[in-house]
């Protein structure tokens, strides 16, 4: 159990660090946009990776890596709490249209990306 917890912690540190670096990179590339582009992109990418890993792990017998990859790396990488904060911040600024768009895109595209990740992984395996 302790080894699993340490694997989750290590994965979380890796995922969170990647999320931070992507956020900084997006900010440097686009400047302050007033729209949470970095968090949106991370959540979509993370969902696609989660979908792909679920399928690959099941077919390749890698489910033992799930705590490290899914709970740790991808759990630290994607961020529902940051999503919630960004949505409320947009609402508080009075940017109701942007808030609704952000919520819709985050949910819709992340779910679609997860499904695409699963389909891509299945395509690789067959």
UniProtKB/Swiss-Prot annotation:
Record key words, sorted: Cell inner membrane, Cell membrane, Ion channel, Ion transport, Membrane, Metal-binding, Sodium, Transmembrane, Transmembrane helix, Transport
Compartments where located: Cell inner membrane
Transmembrane segments: 2-22, 37-57, 65-85, 99-119
Native source organism of the sequence: Ruegeria sp. (strain TM1040) (Silicibacter sp.)
PANTHER family listed in its UniProt record: FLUORIDE EXPORT PROTEIN 1-RELATED (PTHR28259:SF1)
Family affiliation: Belongs to the fluoride channel Fluc/FEX (TC 1.A.43) family.
Entry protein name: Fluoride-specific ion channel FluC
Biological role: Fluoride-specific ion channel. Important for reducing fluoride concentration in the cell, thus reducing its toxicity.
Catalytic activity: fluoride(in) = fluoride(out)
GO biological process: cellular detoxification of fluoride
């Amino acid at each position: 159990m302790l080894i699993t917890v340490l694997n989750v912690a290590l994965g979380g540190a890796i995922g969170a660090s990647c999320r931070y670096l992507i956020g900084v990179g997006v900010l440097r590339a686009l400047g302050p946009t007033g729209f949470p582009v970095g968090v949106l992109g991370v959540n979509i990418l993370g969902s696609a990776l989660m979908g792909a890993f679920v399928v690959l792990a099941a077919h390749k017998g890698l489910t033992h890596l799930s705590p490290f990859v899914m709970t740790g790396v991808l759990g630290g990488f994607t961020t529902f709490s940051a999503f919630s904060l960004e949505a409320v911040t947009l609402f508080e600024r009075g940017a109701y249209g942007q808030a609704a768009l952000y919520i819709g895109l985050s949910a819709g595209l992340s779910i679609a990306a997860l499904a695409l990740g699963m389909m891509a992984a299945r395509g690789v395996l067959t």
